Amino acid sequence: MTAPVRFPRFFVTSPAPCPYLPGRSERKVFTELKGANADELNDALGRIGFRRSQTVAYRPSCIDCQACVSVRVVTGEFRPSSTQKRIHKRNRDLEVSICKAWSTPEQFELLQRYLAVRHPGGGMAAMDEMDFADMVEHTPVKSYVIEYREPTVDGSQGRLVGACLTDEQGDGLSMIYSFYDPQHETRSGLGTFIILDHIQRAARAGLPYVYLGYWVEGSERMQYKVRFRPMEKLGRDGWERFEPAEQASAIERAVTARKCEPASLVEGSLKDGVHGAQERYAHI
């Protein structure tokens, strides 16, 4: 006898200050990922704009705002810009390894340095090593950590300069959280390189998309995501391709925003997250 299908229960968080747009509040809807069908549910929810944080899938559900837009890169048609080509060339000697979703002290130390520069005073800045382990290891779906290390002459394990917690979905790779050395002496653009590597990796695996999370028009520090072309965004009628002129205009605004921001705070300085979302919620 076939077991009955269990539909997920969804909850909504209480309003909280928006981390992207000053003066606004945010609210999220979320559900728990668990059991034998967690991967299947995560795939289905990912296609309608949900993101994963540990055992929770969530998406914005703000009352008076729809600024957070889910975006994904079309891997088979991706064409890097001249700047992206230079960044890739500068960092292509890095040793890239796919590791099990298991935290290490070396990863945590790199995360702390990253947060100290990119998110000083942010919600994640107070994370301890146990919190980091929970973030990486508490996953009910197919996940891994991709590490980026400098090469060594003798073939020994080199210095860790970047890492990304990544989910493998049925139609692509979902970049859950990436971090890197924000003050490396010679390697600028590490955040961009990690995205480029994911695009190449997905294309080689026959996966059509790389999910980058939410692009927030009006949030200067989120504009870096729109620089990868071609890109699709999730709207009321489903996924649709950015019009070339529309994306070119968004990229121009991103370049302008970059010139106005301190260098240490531009690339990837705000991340999608549902930190503490389970603390205050109502069933819907």
Swiss-Prot record:
Main location as per UniProt: cytoplasm
Keywords noted in UniProt: Acyltransferase, Cytoplasm, Transferase
Gene Ontology annotations for the cellular component aspect, listed alphabetically: cytoplasm
GO molecular function: arginyl-tRNA--protein transferase activity; leucyl-tRNA--protein transferase activity
Subcellular localization(s) per the UniProt record: Cytoplasm
Entry's transmembrane regions: none
Disulfide bonds: none
EC annotation from Swiss-Prot or TrEMBL: 2.3.2.29
Pfam families in the record: ATE_C, ATE_N
Top-rank EC class of the record's enzyme: transferase
InterPro entries xref list: Acyl_CoA_acyltransferase (IPR016181), Asp_Glu_LeuTrfase (IPR017138), N-end_Aminoacyl_Trfase (IPR030700), N-end_Aminoacyl_Trfase_C (IPR007472), N-end_Aminoacyl_Trfase_N (IPR007471)
UniProt catalytic activity: N-terminal L-glutamyl-[protein] + L-leucyl-tRNA(Leu) = N-terminal L-leucyl-L-glutamyl-[protein] + tRNA(Leu) + H(+); N-terminal L-aspartyl-[protein] + L-leucyl-tRNA(Leu) = N-terminal L-leucyl-L-aspartyl-[protein] + tRNA(Leu) + H(+)
PANTHER family: ARGININE-TRNA-PROTEIN TRANSFERASE 1 (PTHR21367), ARGINYL-TRNA--PROTEIN TRANSFERASE 1 (PTHR21367:SF1)
Function: Functions in the N-end rule pathway of protein degradation where it conjugates Leu from its aminoacyl-tRNA to the N-termini of proteins containing an N-terminal aspartate or glutamate.
NCBIfam families according to UniProt: PRK01305.1-3, PRK01305.1-4, PRK01305.2-3
Name assigned to this protein: Aspartate/glutamate leucyltransferase
Organism, as annotated: Novosphingobium aromaticivorans (strain ATCC 700278 / DSM 12444 / CCUG 56034 / CIP 105152 / NBRC 16084 / F199)
